[in-house]
């Protein structure tokens, strides 16, 4: 049994693919106690936080390129009692996330 499941959620806007939503996460949560890291590869991650929290996510990873105020989003994720991860596209400088590393 896996200790960790990484779930890529794509919206066909931020990235050119479309994948699963909260209903699928909820369905697999019903049969698994494994840690779920939900990677929001979406244009507006804030819009999906509550749905994935209710579906059973343990952590949310968002892309730094999708938010104007990463600190606020980090606080919102933490307020849902979820762990936080930050991701970036290959062309995005690593320095974009360094100011937030002490918050995650």
Q: What feature does the model see in each segment?
A:
Residues 27-35:
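Short, structured active-site "lid" loops
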Residues 31, 47-48, 57-104:
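Conserved anion-binding
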